[in-house]
Amino acid sequence: MSNWSHKHILDLSSFSIEDYQTVVELANRFKTIPRSGSRKLPALQGRLIATLFFEPSTRTRSSFELAAKRLSADVQSFAPSNSSLIKGETPLDTVMTYVAMGAHVLVVRHGGTGVPEQLAKSLDQKKKNVSILNGGDGLHSHPSQGLLDLFTLTQFFNKESPSPRNIAGKRIAIVGDILHSRVARSNLWSLTACGANVVLCGPPSLLPDDFAKFVEAPPSGQKKDPIKNRGKVTISRCLKEALTDTDAVITLRLQKERMSENLLSNLDKYHNEYGITHESLKWCGKHVPVLHPGPVNRGIEMSSELLEDNSISLIENQVSNGIPIRMALLYLLSADKN
């Protein structure tokens, strides 16, 4: 906590290994609190957390709101359909309304890439002591999902002592619609920062050839990468090649709502070539976990049988881990605000 320096959490590109360690350790402390009584902590009593979701969400929004309530914060929820957006109000107008109401942290999800960052810059220019936490923006970033996936994997590899160090040297495959996935981008930052080597796998239409260079550029506004020994990123078009000797698999939803009709015409062919099943996991050569950020298209990204196999599928773990991870982020951003 003493070394935490982030006023906003917009993506994970500027996170140091110490930042990841801080978040994982704090989330683990929140997760291990005895599940008895009210299960609430007074840590953020008197703080106001507002969830401003300009784009639909079930898991992320519910998780953030439950996380805030478990820290005893007041929660205000924003729904575009019941707002003044239909009257011409801009996202900044909406944000400033909640700032005027005394909000300490604004969790913002928006379909436009870069909108949370623009809002954060506007608040800083106005010298407002209010934090923006990106709940997912366009194709850019979904930092809390990247962190909860990291936390879930650290638990799998060492349940007694979850730590980013647990994934150093591991080979992790990310399979599916990487082109349209803000989750993939956040996972690339977090996993490689902690020393994992990532292989990206998908058809050319969903995985550009130059995507492996994504983590090579310095983070926005910085001269150099804060990570000294970042893991490597490679691309494979062959699922068997990608899964061979892999230690964990993250499969991604086909975001059909973001695709043109001819981008991926045959879903059966996609499942046959890139779908994760019990049979395809044999290529890993060992027992490996499978993660998915949800919602899952059954029989496309992964088989229904695998989805329901809790000895392999960590999807339920991801959902439950989302709460302590988001508790940690809300605490780090708002605990020191007056």
Swiss-Prot record:
Name of the coding gene: pyrB
Recorded catalytic activity of this chain's protein: carbamoyl phosphate + L-aspartate = N-carbamoyl-L-aspartate + phosphate + H(+)
A Pfam cross-reference name: OTCace
Entry's Gene Ontology molecular function annotations: amino acid binding; aspartate carbamoyltransferase activity
Protein name (database record): Aspartate carbamoyltransferase catalytic subunit
GO cellular component: a single term: cytosol
Binding-site positions, L-aspartate: K87, R182, R253
Pathway: Pyrimidine metabolism; UMP biosynthesis via de novo pathway; (S)-dihydroorotate from bicarbonate: step 2/3
Keyword check for Transferase: yes
